[in-house]
Every structure is written in C-alpha cells, then in structure tokens.
C-alpha cells in the first residue's frame, strides 16, 4: 500500500485493519527512516491510539549519521525537518535556527527536497554569520558520499553541486568561539 502526505486519516486507519486481525506488518520509507519527516508518523500515531504494538527496528539513519560525522555538538541537537519553501519564510527560519543554536549551544539539523538543496545552501551562506559552522552531509553511505563541516566564510570558497542529491544540513553557532 502507498501512503503519502495527502492521505486522509480515515484512509490511513485502513492500513492498520490487518494489524487488528493479529497480522504483523512493517512500515518502510522510500527514503530515510519511517515516521521521521515522513507521512508514516500518522500510521504510528493511529497504531498507538488503537493499542497496536509498535516495534522500531534498528537501521541506519542519515540524520544520526550526519550528526555523528559533523564534529558539531552531539550532546544537544535538534532535528527541524523541512524548512519553509517560501524564500522569505525560509530565510527567517534560518536566522531563527542560528539564534537558537547560539542561545542554547544546540546543533540544528534540517533537510530539503533534493532539487532545492543548492538554493538552500546559497541561502545559508547568504544569511548566516561568517563564523557559523555548516555541515553538508549528502549521499550518506553511497560511493559519492560527501560530508564536510566548514564555517560560512570557508564554504563561500567552495563550489558544490547538491542538485538532486539527498542531503542533511547542520548549523552550529558556538557561543564559546564568538
């Protein structure tokens, strides 16, 4: 069965009818981890509401792998999902996340649809403070994997094509290094 962000709650509850009959089922995601920035979260919520046992299975998570390889604060971090598509709203959100990173010494992770990655990176380099660190982790676990962390000032000297490549972005403005 196919589930996407446009599915209605009534429709999604049908996915669990077989579970109510005692049949074990699995939830897979076409990219990433099920239910994390993924419409599968609605299925999991309905399962809990219907007292259906939910068992997470261990597997690779690009979010955690990016955080592990970033060199940024792994003690205090937040995953923010997708930033707004609207340019003005996205730019405001980037500033808000940078402030949050500085105020709480918290690494901020987010993702973008692969065909908008290049624009997001340009916005980061335009908006963030020159000393804010940015990690770009793309194609994680693929032969073309690229994971680098630099300051905004350093990133401005690098030409990187992220178009249609799955990527995680992390920013961190360390209050101790300002």
Which residues does each PLM region occupy?
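A contiguous loop/helix-start segment that scaffolds small-molecule binding in enzyme catalytic cores
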Residues: 20-24, 103-178
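A short acidic, often aromatic-flanked loop/helix-cap motif at beta-alpha or helix-coil junctions
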Residues: 6-11, 85-88, 141-145, 176-177
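Class I S-adenosyl-L-methionine
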Residues: 1-53
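Short, well-ordered secondary-structure micro-motifs
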Residues: 13, 38, 66-69, 89-91, ...
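Gly/Ser/Thr-rich loops at beta-strand to alpha-helix junctions
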Residues: 32-35, 62, 115-116
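Short, hinge-like loop/turn segments at secondary-structure boundaries
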Residues: 17-19, 45-46, 70-75, 127, ...
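Class I SAM-dependent methyltransferase SAM-binding "motif I" and its flanking Rossmann-like core
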Residues: 42-100
């Amino acid at each position: 069965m196919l589930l996407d962000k446009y599915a209605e709650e009534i429709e999604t509850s049908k996915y669990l009818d077989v579970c109510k009959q005692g049949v074990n089922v699995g939830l897979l995601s076409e990219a990433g981890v099920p239910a994390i920035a993924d419409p599968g979260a609605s299925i999991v919520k309905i399962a809990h509401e219907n007292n259906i046992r939910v068992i997470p299975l261990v597997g690779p998570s690009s979010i955690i792998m990016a955080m592990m390889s970033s060199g940024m604060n792994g003690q205090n971090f937040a995953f923010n999902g997708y930033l707004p598509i609207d340019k003005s709203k996205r730019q405001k959100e980037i500033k808000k996340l940078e402030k949050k990173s500085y105020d709480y010494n918290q690494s901020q992770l987010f993702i973008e649809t692969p065909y908008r990655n290049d624009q997001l990176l340009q916005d980061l380099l335009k908006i963030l403070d020159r000393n804010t660190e940015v990690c770009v982790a793309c194609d994680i676990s693929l032969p073309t994997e690229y994971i680098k962390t630099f300051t905004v000032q350093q990133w401005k000297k690098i030409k990187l094509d992220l178009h249609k490549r799955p990527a995680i972005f992390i920013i961190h403005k360390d209050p101790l290094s300002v």
